[in-house]
Design a protein with these regions (language model features):
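Charge-dense, low-complexity intrinsically disordered segments
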Residues: 8-11, 108, 129, 133
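Conserved ATP-binding N-box helix of the HATPase_c
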Residues: 53, 129-154
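A contiguous, low-structure linker/loop signature
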Residues: 72-108
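Helix-loop-beta hinge of the Bergerat
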Residues: 98-127
Length: 154
């Protein structure tokens, strides 16, 4: 089943995105193709929404595939944040910059992910090791709370 997404994947198009995600989740076919071919722009909100839909589709037993955006810049951005790998396509293809962190499923606290987040936060800001340690503890606490309060079995 092909689910064709709109040109703009943003919080302003949330209703359309939610409808498309529900369409994918409701599919009775094993293969669900997220067709992003006409998409030209995405914001982090849309990526989070799509990632949640992908995870739910995989959990329901769907095989998720992508029709990648025709816009090269958007395609490269999705690849660079691990979006395709998150959905099971192109594993290991992500190429992260110092301003990005990988889109990832959590089952517990991961110190390497905390270091990636700190790398992004500290990329343009000089801070003492003491402040960095405090920030590390805050990020760990935030990730722990998010997982503990998500009521998710995974």
């Amino acid at each position: 089943m092909d689910v064709k997404f709109p040109p703009y994947l943003t919080i302003r198009t949330a209703r359309s995105l939610v409808n498309k995600c529900e369409e994918a989740l409701g599919s009775r076919q094993r293969d669900v193709n997220f067709d992003l071919s006409i998409s030209v722009f995405s914001d982090p909100f849309a990526v989070t929404l799509l990632a949640g839909a992908i995870k739910a589709c995989v959990k329901k037993g769907h095989r998720v595939q992508f029709v990648k955006p025709n816009v090269k810049k958007l395609d490269e951005w999705f690849d660079s944040i691990g979006f395709y790998a998150f959905g099971g396509a192109d594993p290991g293809s992500a190429k992260y910059s110092e301003r990005q962190v990988e889109l990832r499923r959590f089952s517990n606290l991961d110190p390497t992910y905390t270091e990636q987040v700190l790398g992004v936060l500290c990329n343009d800001i000089r801070m003492s090791e003491r402040v960095r340690d405090s920030l590390r503890m805050s990020v760990n606490e935030m990730l722990t709370n998010a997982f503990d309060h998500s009521q998710s079995p995974e």
